UniProtKB/Swiss-Prot annotation:
This is Cytochrome b. GO terms for molecular function: metal ion binding; ubiquinol-cytochrome-c reductase activity. One of its GO terms (biological process) is mitochondrial electron transport, ubiquinol to cytochrome c. Heme 1 (or BL or b562) is low-potential and absorbs at about 562 nm, and heme 2 (or BH or b566) is high-potential and absorbs at about 566 nm. Its cofactor is heme b. It comes from Abrothrix olivaceus (Olive grass mouse). It comes from the Eukaryota. The chain crosses the membrane at residues 33-53, 77-98, 113-133, 178-198, 226-246. Binds 2 heme b groups non-covalently. It is found in: Mitochondrion inner membrane. The cytochrome bc1 complex contains 11 subunits: 3 respiratory subunits (MT-CYB, CYC1 and UQCRFS1), 2 core proteins (UQCRC1 and UQCRC2) and 6 low-molecular weight proteins (UQCRH/QCR6, UQCRB/QCR7, UQCRQ/QCR8, UQCR10/QCR9, UQCR11/QCR10 and a cleavage product of UQCRFS1). This cytochrome bc1 complex then forms a dimer. Heme b b566 binds at residues 97, 196.
Amino acid sequence: MTIMRKNHPLLKIINHSFIDLPTPSNISSWWNFGSLLGICLMIQILTGLFLAMHYTSDTATAFSSVTHICRDVNYGWLIRYLHANGASMFFICLFIHVGRGIYYGSYMLSETWNIGIILFLTTMATAFVGYVLPWGQMSFWGATVITNLLSAIPYIGTSLVEWIWGGFSVDKATLTRFFAFHFILPFIITAFVLVHLLFLHETGSNNPSGLNSNSDKIPFHPYYTIKDLLGVILLLMVLMILVLFFPDVLGDPDNYTPANPLNTPAH
């Protein structure tokens, strides 16, 4: 098995990335969040795929299709809330991951950092278009307000907003294209994640001391696979507590009111 792991064209890539990878011996729990982000991304793609099987991206039926998922689809409520709260966990991990990078000077690894910035912005875009899909009041007015920010661009602003909307307001065309973007962007994110890892493994990871750790490396497996597994268990525990006990605590009650272009949410 060891010979195959080290020589097989596909397995040796995995081997050099997750098994025999030389890793600094002193990286702390702040370094766990990269793997947690990978887990979050997998959860989001899987739950999102199953949601897409039942969702309809039409203004007349989008809201009721989400209700249908929660009420009529087997474990649809679980899939929907895993996806919604999984997105929140994704961003919590993302902020900590970036914060650790700033605190410990990981921005010195410029290629890895720049791909990370692209990942951050792409994830924000994905979350934004995804929030519009349930077509509640906050979905509709959130989309209206955020896209309207582009109208501040001199000369081309108004035309740009109408181009993104596909009309003169957030409507059917907007919802359809946002669903298309929301479906494709996670796969683009996955591709960028591989590039992010590629650049990271070119230089090796940073470590809390900030010193060169080439003289003190240990194999990634079993040491950091076990450490990451603990992080994953804790992440899933927090996620499941949210999903099973407090599924709506991070959401807005106004999004349970269908989108109405004639009324802004009560505030």
